[in-house]
Amino acid sequence: TQLMSDIWHTVATKDTTLLRRGIDKKASLPQAPVFQNYLRNRNTVRWNLDYDFLKDSFITEGPHRDYLNEFLSGLFPNSFARGEIYVNPETEESELCGTTASLAGIERFDYEGNTDGVNRGIRYDVALHALLLSLPGIPVLRSGDEIGQLNDYTYKADPSRASDPRWLHNGHFNWILARNRADAETIQGRIFNSLEQ
């Protein structure tokens, strides 16, 4: 989860220093270990960042975690991301939920009818996946990432799941939208065709 945390830290801060350091560390390891790399897993984004390193940039853990969660959940002004915050009952730390496409801005801009924003979100989504595919190890795509699936808010209508925002990015695969992957003019088609290359 270290690299996943570094990637989303970079998205929220636009500072690649920590990510570059993490990639360099991974690349310097012996070839024997095999890693799985992912942008999103089935659980949350936990902020397993190297705060000892970040303190040299005057970044402190608590306020920084708050910023990351607020930016990526869309609470921070001018944020393009749409996620939700999950408070881990064991650690009482706030963690992040959301699909890659929604965290990359596609959900917000599509909802607003902002074509330029959607295009930017698609480029962001594809760039994040290109990074994932270029890293040493085995890239793992989350179900729905290949078509830019957005957050699934239907969990809130189910009393057995409503209190757990981790269902936000663990919804049912949208087979209807998946059909659009053959149409290069759609969000689904643009992402699918880019990842297929």
Where are each of the predicted segments found?
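Active-site and adjacent substrate-binding regions of carbohydrate-active enzymes
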Residues: 1-197
